[in-house]
Amino acid sequence: MKTELRSCAACGEPISDRFFLEVGGCSWHAHCLRCCMCMCPLDRQQSCFIRERQVYCKADYSKNFGAKCSKCCRGISASDWVRRARELVFHLACFACDQCGRQLSTGEQFALMDDRVLCKAHYLETVEGGTTSSDEGCDGDGYHKSKTKRVRTTFTEEQLQVLQANFQIDSNPDGQDLERIASVTGLSKRVTQVWFQNSRARQKKHIHAGKNKIREPEGSSFARHINLQLTYSFQNNAQNPMHLNGSKAGLYPTHESSMDELSQDSSVHCMPSEV
């Protein structure tokens, strides 16, 4: 009895080869399975991606359909540390105040205005017309005088990853560990020490605030508009496919408020449809 040959999903020709590929419920000649964009062969790849019956290599799928940073618009890989603000996702180093450029830390309050991230000081300055005291002061005669501005240290994404990872292991490292971390990050021991001190203070304040929540008066504009706490998350490869264009109903409160509260780490599933 003659067995009917399978047809290749790419070229449509019968498959008489001893070996062939089964992808997405279809059969392929080994040499016919290629990325629809770059045309690279996929027969020796560990995985590929299918979307609307088109086959993609990992790089092209990530470039076209993967999660992207809301600040720099570059792709976010599965190994990137990220920060979330509502439905927006940012690289760790990209999450900074749009006004002053200062990177925001875990536990620090911020606001979103038209998808722009603002620190607490510049948010209040924007909505209430106030001024921050860090830029200029006023003497007794009413004349303004400039204050010496403290130089802020800006950390790279890689440095923040190392610092955050070590903080999770030990929030109060000794001198030897501080020297090791400083050597790895390329920072001075003093800067590293101050970063850990500030992180411990923010952590303590955040924990204390969680135990002693006091309801703000209704007239407090900051209580109405800013109640986001920064969290960080480590992206994992998606184990279960998710719809990129799915409805977001139920993810956020329905009451009228410009901000939501993030209290847990979460992951971004940027690689659905992997086969």
UniProtKB/Swiss-Prot annotation:
SUPFAM superfamilies: Glucocorticoid receptor-like (DNA-binding domain) (SSF57716), Homeodomain-like (SSF46689)
DNA-binding region per UniProt: 148-207
Keyword Repeat: yes
PROSITE patterns xrefs: HOMEOBOX_2, LIM_DOMAIN_1, LIM_DOMAIN_2
Gene Ontology biological-process entries: compound eye development; imaginal disc development; neuron differentiation; regulation of DNA-templated transcription; regulation of gene expression; regulation of transcription by RNA polymerase II
GO molecular function annotations of the record: DNA-binding transcription factor activity; DNA-binding transcription factor activity, RNA polymerase II-specific; metal ion binding; RNA polymerase II transcription regulatory region sequence-specific DNA binding
Pfam families: Homeodomain, LIM
Outcome after substituting residue 88 to T: In allele 13; may alter structure of LIM domain
Identification of the protein by name: LIM/homeobox protein Awh
Organism: Drosophila melanogaster (Fruit fly)
Originating gene: Awh
